[in-house]
């Protein structure tokens, strides 16, 4: 996985190379803040990610995931997750989240993710929840 924005973001040339090799692409959104993800509306954050992906030439409607990275110490709002996922999905990408579900460290992500799954179980907004902890690599 590569980042969608920031210092080591993926380039348009890399996107083209990966597409030519029929590779799966997962892009991480690392410029979010706790203030943003703890609000009730993630629509603007999602539109910003979608526009960045389009500018880089990331193809739509081919199963490419845009992962919102949620830091382990952050609080998050499941309504932010729902509106973020809905906007990402409506724009041709797979909504996904990276977060630490180790409830002994921060129960908030685990609880809010559960609310998100329950609230979206009858719609196709759920992409993936990618879990990690600081002592291991991505799983």
Regions found by a protein language model. Name each.
Residues 1-84, 89-91:
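Substrate-binding cleft of extracellular glycoside hydrolase catalytic domains
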Residues 45-62, 71-139:
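Surface-exposed substrate-engagement region within the catalytic domains
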């Amino acid at each position: 996985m590569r980042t969608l924005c920031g210092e080591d973001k993926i380039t348009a040339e890399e996107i083209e190379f990966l597409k030519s090799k029929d590779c799966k692409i997962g892009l991480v959104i690392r410029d979010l803040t706790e203030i943003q993800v703890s609000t009730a509306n993630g629509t603007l954050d999602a539109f910003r990610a979608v526009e960045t992906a389009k500018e880089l030439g990331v193809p739509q409607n081919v199963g490419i995931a845009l992962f919102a990275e949620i830091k382990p110490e952050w609080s998050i709002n499941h309504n932010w997750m729902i509106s973020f996922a809905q906007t990402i999905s409506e724009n041709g990408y797979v909504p996904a989240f990276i977060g630490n579900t180790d409830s002994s460290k921060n129960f908030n992500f685990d609880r809010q993710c559960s609310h998100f799954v329950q609230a979206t179980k009858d719609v196709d907004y759920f992409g993936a929840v990618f879990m990690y902890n600081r002592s291991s690599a991505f799983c």
